């Protein structure tokens, strides 16, 4: 299984944004929509071997974490276009309005869950799955020997990670990179998926 943990410092945590202007009103939730597309969508099929956590820290009610389980998501629930994905995320956020317990997940749709887990909670929960932090100054991905069972990747948004978050991750997960420049999160996910396909990692 492949796991992607995407932390957004700005994406809204309530359905208070306009579908007509997702980038301008949602705290760059469009980045999350494109990342989900890159994680799951193939030309004529859907990746069932992928799990994605989107950890949202934008206003008005952070944190909110949405977990997407590719193996359980029903066909046509998660589509390639940003608008339908933004609507879906809005529906999920509405369903999680009244969640109080920090780590209790609520299944909103088959394979899609919402909780109040923090970024640190999500990392700790998945640390057994061989996590890697994707950063420009990491080890070249081509030099990494990945395990054949489960592997996970931690990615930031347009703002990256706070110093506190980097300190938390230091020594906990190794840093790797796909290249020397700051790439779009969705492009990094697409590259990682293609690279793992090429080297035969499930």
Curated annotation (Swiss-Prot):
Compartment(s) of residence: Cytoplasm
Enzyme category, top tier: transferase
Gene Ontology MF: a single term: tRNA methyltransferase activity
EC number: 2.1.1.257
Ranges that cross the membrane: none
Record note on quaternary structure: Homodimer.
Family of the protein in this entry: Belongs to the methyltransferase superfamily. TrmY family.
Annotated protein name in UniProt: tRNA (pseudouridine(54)-N(1))-methyltransferase
Organism: Pyrococcus furiosus (strain ATCC 43587 / DSM 3638 / JCM 8422 / Vc1)
Lineage of the organism: Archaea, Methanobacteriati, Methanobacteriota, Thermococci, Thermococcales
Gene: trmY
């Amino acid at each position: 299984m492949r796991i992607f943990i995407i932390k957004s410092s700005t994406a809204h945590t309530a359905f208070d944004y306009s579908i007509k202007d997702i980038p301008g009103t949602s705290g760059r939730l469009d980045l999350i929509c494109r990342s989900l597309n890159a994680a799951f969508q193939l030309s004529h099929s859907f990746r069932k071997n992928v799990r994605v956590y989107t950890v949202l820290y934008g206003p008005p009610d952070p944190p909110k974490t949405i977990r997407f389980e590719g193996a359980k998501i029903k066909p046509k629930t998660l589509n390639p276009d940003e608008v339908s994905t933004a609507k879906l995320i809005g529906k999920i956020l509405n369903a999680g309005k009244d969640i109080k317990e920090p780590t209790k997940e609520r299944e909103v749709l088959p394979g899609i869950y919402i909780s109040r887990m923090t970024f640190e909670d999500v990392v700790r929960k998945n640390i057994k799955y061989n996590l890697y932090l994707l950063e420009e100054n990491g080890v070249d991905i081509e030099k990494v020997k990945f395990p054949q069972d489960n592997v996970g990747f931690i990615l930031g948004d347009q703002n990256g990670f706070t110093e506190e978050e980097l300190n938390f991750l230091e020594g906990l997960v190794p840093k790797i990179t796909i290249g020397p420049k700051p790439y779009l999160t969705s492009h990094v996910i697409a590259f990682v998926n293609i690279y793992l396909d090429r080297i035969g990692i499930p």
